[in-house]
Amino acid sequence: MPWIETYRGAASPWECDVTEHFTLAFYVDRIAMAEATLAEGLGLLGMLREGGFARRYDVRLARELRAGSAFHIESAATRGDGSLRLGHRVVDSVSGEVATWFDGYWDGVDAKPPAEGLARWNGPDFAPRPEPTDLARLIPSMAGRVQPGDLDEFGRMGLAGMVHKFSDAAVQFGAAIGLTADYIKTARRSFSAFELRLRIARSPGLGEAYRIDTGLAHLGNTSLRYLHVMRDPTTGREIARADRYGVQLDLDARRPAPLAPELRERAQRLLLPMG
Amino acid sequence: MEPWIETYRGAVSPWETDVTEHFTVAFYFDRIAMAEASLAAELGLGETLRAGGFARRYDVRYARELRAGSAFHIESAALSTEAGVRLGHRFVDSVTGEAITWFDVHWDGVAATVPDSRIAGDWDGPEFETRADPKDLARLIPTAAGRVQPGDLDEFGRMGICGIVHKFTDSSVQIGAAIGLTADYIKTGRRGFSTFEFRVRVAAESVGLGDIYRNRTGIAHLGNSSLRFLHVMSDPKTGREIARLGQFGVTLDLDKRRPAGLAPELRERAERLVLPT
């Protein structure tokens, strides 16, 4: 059973963001279902339910989904030695084109699906990106407590819950460089992610506090890379981090657009030292 | 106590509207779930509803639209306790006082005693004519699949009526796209699908957190501007039917808010998905 359909549905208008497309956290909402269904098919649902291992998701957003888009997800195990690797492709149900790839890893999980159960990964390769050498210059971008709506079917803070918080952090960080709600509305410019690197060390439970700090790991002509780190504010222990690569988008042309000089100036002040 | 009681009061939030630019059907059911539970409690049937284990039917007529910012309330009453429990709910525009949507609900096989004074004799909702469902469902196409998530649950911890209808709405988007009523077409052609009647059937055995569902859909009627979608939700492991929805509506001119004939290329695609009746 290499590739199986693990989700089918649509993008609702209330799942779209100020960039006027399906927001990242709702992709991840569907991937959480797809992952559990694939795990069940592989006999690994109990392991996923139990948790206790780190997970990584490398995501490439190639084509936009917008309000009313019909889509489905195909999923498969793509490797099983050392760390389990699970692939998911989000497919536009109208055109049949892959809109987004999720390359997921369960670190240290030595599950070995049968060879005939492994699929060939036809998504992009995700090259390592340089990491910041010092996180002291991250700025506060989000804080709160895990609420019932953040939980997944296993009763922990779910993938979608986490990414919603990282989206809030992106809005806060955007505002800090001048990409405010007013600016987005009047200048018709916004931030659109094309790549996400999500690392989850552990999943907090109901009522646990978290905070997110954010910095800028890259500043190009139109491109920006936000690094968000979610931590337990009491212990400082890292919960998750999201590395979000994107561009400033012209909301009408749906094409990258250079940052205005005043925004660039602010953004430069938030650049992190890179290794 | 009057037979009719107010069981909900509130408003339509902008994020509860859909691509047809009005209050989306699943959120009507979000409010009806509350109204139904409040009415059941008033009638002494709260525990019956909580325990579940009986099939429910919801016949719904949408007469006027609610849009972002609309203020509305729901009035509810028991209509009968003969041959099961029958409950009525009417959505009322809080500004005009007009009833705009009616829910005629049946709890099949539930024996209950309600005082005569609590039975409303003035149901002003429509009669729902019998509609024949197709006998052969082999030509239904896949339109939704997923797992029951925490947000799909109702206050009793089962997949709620709102969660079920959200999945049927996804199915409606998928079958719409299959006939060419895509997101792009809706945006540029300014046409959407607007429902005027719902027939929901929910099986006695409910589904819970983490359970898998699959929806399949076909077209049970194709008129000039009208379409009737038949959606069937089932458990893919056992094939057991969880719920079904007969959704009658029209293609709507989004600017005039009036029915509009299907474009020929959409009609051609739709004809291929019409089920034998």
Task: Identify the meaning behind each predicted range.
Chain A
Residues 1-56, 100-195, 250-275:
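Hot-dog-fold acyl-thioester-processing enzymes
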Residues 6-7, 58-70, 76-138, 200, ...:
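HotDog/MaoC-like acyl-thioester-processing domains
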